[in-house]
Amino acid sequence: AIYAEARQLLDWNARNPFCAQCGQPTLSVNGGFKRTCPPKDLARTNSKSSSGVTNALSNVPEPPTDETARPPCATRKGVSNLSFPRTDPTVIMAVVNHAGDKILLGRSKRFPPYWYSTLAGFAEPAESIEEAVRREVYEESGILVGRVVIHSTQPWPYPANLMIGAVGQSIPEGEVIDLGNDPELEDAKWYSFEEVREALRVGTSGIGEEAGKDWKEGGLRLPPHTAIANQIITSVVCNGFVSGVPKM
């Protein structure tokens, strides 16, 4: 958690050195949790300070002069999301077929051979999590999802994602896979719960890691236990997460 917070704050501060409102350089304050657009150019003020302590660090604020004053900026008039770290909501979902005995998994070209995971994507402005799940699943796989249940969340600071895990269930007439809507996935398949349980036992690993010693060539591979994708897959195929909620 400490690493994730630090990673996200460092990345955000490095990417946002200028004010999005007026374009002037900003200052990192509050331990990196905020960037502020000051009313005067502190760099030029510091260079003209005759004391041993610069004006930027002085306890007595100096009024802006004509030489150091900056143009008016809306971010100084109140709380504004222009000055705070961004967090991008991202949906990641295990999709179960209507019969409740298969799970949809996909893979991109960068994945190792036989390595599959849950589908995922960014939520769009003014979109609910449930709507984002249905849209992303349809765009990437052509599957139509009805019921959506939010499962859990995981921060993912690469650079600023909040992974919102969900479980969706397809409608009977919308279970044919079609990758033609979006070229993001190389492949998507329906896997039986039995096959996925076996992969959870012997075939979990990170993308750049070797599969477990009991994994056999050609078998399904899945994300590691530390990933939210693994957690929602496990909840579905091993812990009966879907069966406890009535189907739509």
Please state what every model-predicted region is:
Residues 19-22, 37:
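Short cysteine-rich clusters marking metal-coordination/redox-active sites
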Residues 28-31, 35, 41-117, 144-145, ...:
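N-terminal strand-loop-strand
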Residues 1-18, 27-29, 111-116, 159, ...:
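Nudix hydrolase/Nudix homology domain
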Residues 117-151, 166, 174:
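The catalytic Nudix box helix
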Residues 154-177:
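Active-site-adjacent beta-strand/loop module that shapes the phosphate/pyrophosphate-binding cleft
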Residues 81-85, 156, 180:
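Short Gly/Pro-enriched turn/cap motifs at secondary-structure boundaries
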Residues 7-10, 81, 121, 125:
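Conserved aromatic-histidine-acidic binding/catalytic patches
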Residues 90-91, 129, 186:
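Short loop/turn microsegments at loop-to-beta-strand junctions
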